[in-house]
Design a protein with these regions (language model features):
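Extracytoplasmic low-complexity repetitive segments enriched in small/polar residues
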Residues: 1, 23, 28, 68, ...
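Surface-exposed ligand/attachment interfaces on beta-rich extracellular proteins
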Residues: 1-23, 36-38, 80-83
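Surface-exposed loop/edge segments in extracytoplasmic proteins
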Residues: 2-5, 49-55
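Beta-sandwich interaction modules
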Residues: 16-21, 56-72
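Noncatalytic modules at the cell exterior or secretory-pathway interfaces
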Residues: 24-31, 66-82
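Short, surface-exposed beta-strand/strand-loop-strand elements in extracellular ectodomains
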Residues: 34-51
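Edge beta-strands of jelly-roll/beta-sandwich modules across compartments, strongly enriched
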Residues: 40-43, 81-91
Length: 92
Protein backbone atom coordinates (compact mmCIF):
# COMPACT_ATOMS: atom_id res chain seq x y z
CA UNK A 1 0.00 0.00 0.00
CA UNK A 2 1.42 3.33 -1.08
CA UNK A 3 0.73 6.51 0.85
CA UNK A 4 1.18 10.04 -0.46
CA UNK A 5 0.81 13.02 1.85
CA UNK A 6 -0.34 16.40 0.61
CA UNK A 7 -1.57 19.61 2.15
CA UNK A 8 -4.77 21.26 1.02
CA UNK A 9 -6.74 24.14 2.43
CA UNK A 10 -10.47 23.71 2.91
CA UNK A 11 -12.12 26.84 1.56
CA UNK A 12 -15.26 27.66 -0.37
CA UNK A 13 -13.26 27.82 -3.59
CA UNK A 14 -12.36 24.80 -5.77
CA UNK A 15 -8.92 23.35 -5.06
CA UNK A 16 -6.74 21.06 -7.15
CA UNK A 17 -4.49 18.51 -5.49
CA UNK A 18 -1.85 16.85 -7.65
CA UNK A 19 -0.24 13.64 -6.51
CA UNK A 20 2.43 12.22 -8.85
CA UNK A 21 3.79 9.57 -6.50
CA UNK A 22 1.15 6.85 -6.41
CA UNK A 23 2.22 3.70 -8.25
CA UNK A 24 4.40 5.85 -10.49
CA UNK A 25 1.33 7.31 -12.18
CA UNK A 26 0.16 10.89 -12.06
CA UNK A 27 -3.19 11.31 -10.36
CA UNK A 28 -5.01 14.63 -10.34
CA UNK A 29 -7.53 15.30 -7.61
CA UNK A 30 -10.11 17.96 -8.34
CA UNK A 31 -11.46 18.96 -4.96
CA UNK A 32 -14.52 21.15 -4.59
CA UNK A 33 -15.34 21.92 -1.00
CA UNK A 34 -18.08 23.86 0.70
CA UNK A 35 -18.29 24.84 4.35
CA UNK A 36 -21.84 24.51 5.59
CA UNK A 37 -23.59 26.40 8.36
CA UNK A 38 -23.31 23.36 10.62
CA UNK A 39 -19.55 23.18 10.10
CA UNK A 40 -19.65 20.44 7.48
CA UNK A 41 -17.30 20.48 4.51
CA UNK A 42 -18.44 18.55 1.46
CA UNK A 43 -15.56 17.29 -0.70
CA UNK A 44 -16.04 16.01 -4.23
CA UNK A 45 -13.10 14.11 -5.70
CA UNK A 46 -12.72 13.39 -9.40
CA UNK A 47 -9.88 12.02 -11.50
CA UNK A 48 -8.67 9.22 -9.25
CA UNK A 49 -7.30 6.42 -11.41
CA UNK A 50 -8.17 3.70 -8.90
CA UNK A 51 -10.18 3.39 -5.74
CA UNK A 52 -8.58 4.38 -2.47
CA UNK A 53 -9.01 6.35 0.71
CA UNK A 54 -8.57 10.06 1.25
CA UNK A 55 -7.84 10.92 4.88
CA UNK A 56 -6.94 14.04 6.77
CA UNK A 57 -6.62 15.19 10.36
CA UNK A 58 -5.80 18.76 11.38
CA UNK A 59 -6.51 21.35 14.07
CA UNK A 60 -9.98 22.72 13.43
CA UNK A 61 -11.22 19.43 12.03
CA UNK A 62 -12.71 16.50 13.90
CA UNK A 63 -12.02 14.03 11.12
CA UNK A 64 -11.80 13.71 7.37
CA UNK A 65 -12.59 10.58 5.44
CA UNK A 66 -13.52 10.15 1.81
CA UNK A 67 -14.11 6.88 -0.01
CA UNK A 68 -12.62 7.56 -3.42
CA UNK A 69 -14.73 4.97 -5.18
CA UNK A 70 -17.82 6.90 -4.09
CA UNK A 71 -16.16 10.18 -5.01
CA UNK A 72 -17.88 12.10 -2.24
CA UNK A 73 -17.13 12.52 1.44
CA UNK A 74 -18.07 14.57 4.45
CA UNK A 75 -15.56 16.34 6.67
CA UNK A 76 -16.75 17.31 10.13
CA UNK A 77 -15.22 20.66 11.01
CA UNK A 78 -15.16 22.33 14.42
CA UNK A 79 -15.76 25.72 12.84
CA UNK A 80 -16.49 27.32 9.49
CA UNK A 81 -13.02 28.82 9.34
CA UNK A 82 -10.46 27.70 6.79
CA UNK A 83 -8.38 24.72 7.88
CA UNK A 84 -5.36 23.02 6.36
CA UNK A 85 -5.57 19.24 6.15
CA UNK A 86 -2.66 16.84 5.85
CA UNK A 87 -4.09 14.40 3.35
CA UNK A 88 -2.92 10.90 2.59
CA UNK A 89 -4.04 8.81 -0.36
CA UNK A 90 -3.82 5.09 0.38
CA UNK A 91 -4.08 2.45 -2.33
CA UNK A 92 -3.58 -1.29 -2.37
Amino acid sequence: MATASNNITLTTAPTTLFDPSVDGHAAAFSITNRVGSAGNVLINIAGMHKAGDFRGIAPGLDKAFVNASAGIGLVTAKSDSTATVDCGVDRV
